[in-house]
Amino acid sequence: MGVILLNSNNNNHEQQRSLDEINNTINFNHNDSASQKFLAFLGPGLLVAVGYMDPGNWITSMQGGAQYGYTLLFIILISSLSAMLLQSMTVRLGIATGMDLAQMTRHFLNKPVAIMFWIIAELAIIATDIAEVIGSAIALDLIFGIPLIVGALITVFDVFLLLFIMKFGFRKIEAIVGTLIFTVLAIFVFEVYISSPQITDMLNGFVPHKEIITNQGILYIALGIIGATIMPHNLYLHSSIVQSRKYDRHSIHEKAQAIKYATIDSNIQLSIAFVVNCLLLTLGAALFFGTKTEDLGGFYDLYLALKTEPALGATLGGIMSTLFAVALLASGQNSTITGTLAGQIVMEGFLKLSIPNWLRRLITRSLAVIPVIICLIVFKGNTEKIEQLLVFSQVFLSIALPFSLIPLQLATSNQNLMGPFKNKTWINIISWLLIIVLSGLNVYLIIQTFQEL
């Protein structure tokens, strides 16, 4: 790691504040009651949870349930616990140092290497955006019959919707994201209830099974679930937005309080994401496991399978499939909001460059829409090819993941930077193991994906 330049004399006062327009804007009084402090910090975790229930996770979870029943619920549990640990590290990084992960990575690396990391981070955000464009465009097609190419172009106007919402303050964004998340949650709770899953089999799914390792097919889906869980942009995002609360930046006690309640918020919201992913897998298992429709390839397959499932009947099948599309649209809109903020954090953090938000968002979304449009034109609207592009975007995110995880680990284990908030030894051991395992699994997934082409 010869490129790493540890700057022991870090000075937070010389560092531009992360997301300056929202930084230190939301009241937090450490003298309030525990419930008031919790409510003050409730919100950033919602934006982070979006990345754990994005369109890329949907196919993997439902296909896992359809093909292998409830066996992979254990993998969702382990993935969610790993996510909680890594996101708690970003919380401590942001609050303890006053820097987000992009700023900290720039602080760690010499300029040429930092620029390389910035390019990878930007490409990761574009890859994330591609999934959002595809998910939203497919949802618009399923609900309203809007052609995919028109739906993809419509998503460009999400830029202006977010800019309009931002005028009303960051709390409003948190509220809107929370509303959309609970819309998705409510839809899948209803759909799972209607599908009448076997509760005993569900509970048994949280127990590790040797088939996860011995069965090649189960292992591949398991790796897909794990590899898609930790999103690079979430690590940048979370380390910044936790700084939106007002607390004394020079008080160790107030920082400790802020870290405590921000971590509680994160764990609660990631628990909701865990439930949503379990519901997706359960829905796939309850309706399609052991049937001829168990090989669900994409959103259109899922929609059609729900609509025509004999056990549901025509009316209920129509309702279930429509609600599925509505949830997909809500998920896409949520990811738009978080992707915008993450893009701004990355550009400002790595380059110390601020451009108008509307221009930043327009550039990112345009770069995401262009590959989708080209794919639609070249393959004449072939839905299978457009969903394959979504898979490619997830593969690139897997490649980009170590470039955000390693700086996070190095920073949070550094005494000079973190002071009393540095990683404990057991956290260092687990986080390095996670980095090695996740990186190895992602490499395996990438190889498998290209072999299947």
UniProtKB/Swiss-Prot annotation:
Residue stretches in coiled coil: none
Protein known as: Divalent metal cation transporter MntH
Pfam family, one: Nramp
An MF annotation (GO) of this entry: metal ion binding
GO annotation, biological process: iron ion transmembrane transport
Localization per record: Cell membrane
Function of the molecule: H(+)-stimulated, divalent metal cation uptake system.
Regions that span the bilayer: 39-59, 66-86, 114-134, 146-166, 175-195, 217-237, 270-290, 310-330, 362-382, 388-408, 427-447
InterPro entries: NRAMP_fam
Keywords from the named record: Cell membrane, Ion transport, Membrane, Symport, Transmembrane, Transmembrane helix, Transport
Membrane topology type: Multi-pass membrane protein
Gene source species: Staphylococcus epidermidis (strain ATCC 35984 / DSM 28319 / BCRC 17069 / CCUG 31568 / BM 3577 / RP62A)
Main localization of the protein described in the UniProt heading: membrane
GO cellular component annotations of the record: plasma membrane
